[in-house]
Amino acid sequence: MRTASIKRKTKETDIEVAVNLDGSGVSEVATGIGFFDHMLDLLARHSRIDITVRADGDLHVDHHHTTEDVGIALGQAVKQALGSMVGISRYASVYMPMDETLSRVVIDISGRPVLVFKVGFPRDKIGEFDTELVREWFNAFAVNAGVTLHVETLYGENSHHIAESCFKGLARALRAAVAIDPRAANEVPSTKGQLGG
């Protein structure tokens, strides 16, 4: 089983994250931010990655530190769980509809952290959650997971739908990219013989 646990404690947040890449999509998420919990639940369910997140953050300030630090810890956990990356499919691309919204998510588990994020939100907030934090989370995740990640919303009108299509798109892309390719189960998917540089 490809699993990992990460603990991250700063003056701003105290976070514990665990993942099982070969799970069934079970989630136990408690960040204190309702909308964010909803997105992480979706991520687990649609990636089929078991995800546990417990976060105690300075929510009296705002949601920024908790959202970003969960992205950091979750990215680190995924990277650790991938290990040598032998046998993974590595690449995946997904078009994800959510009612009137359509987003595209493309991932390369390359070891080279890059985020291209072309997503606009018609509103500044979804409930109490600042929409600008969606990008902050994706950036923290991509950098710490060591993945190249392109996220683009082609069109959409509802901020909740836009965010949800991005998280679900990432989930389905991760599900495909971390899957073991049975035709190359003992190979690192790179002509270099290694990933990450």
From Swiss-Prot:
Enzyme class (EC, first level): lyase
KW Amino-acid biosynthesis (keyword) present: yes
Protein name in UniProt: Imidazoleglycerol-phosphate dehydratase
Organism: Nitrobacter winogradskyi (strain ATCC 25391 / DSM 10237 / CIP 104748 / NCIMB 11846 / Nb-255)
Transmembrane segments: none
Annotated keywords: Amino-acid biosynthesis, Cytoplasm, Histidine biosynthesis, Lyase
A cellular component term, taken from the record's GO annotations: cytoplasm
UniProt pathway annotation: Amino-acid biosynthesis; L-histidine biosynthesis; L-histidine from 5-phospho-alpha-D-ribose 1-diphosphate: step 6/9
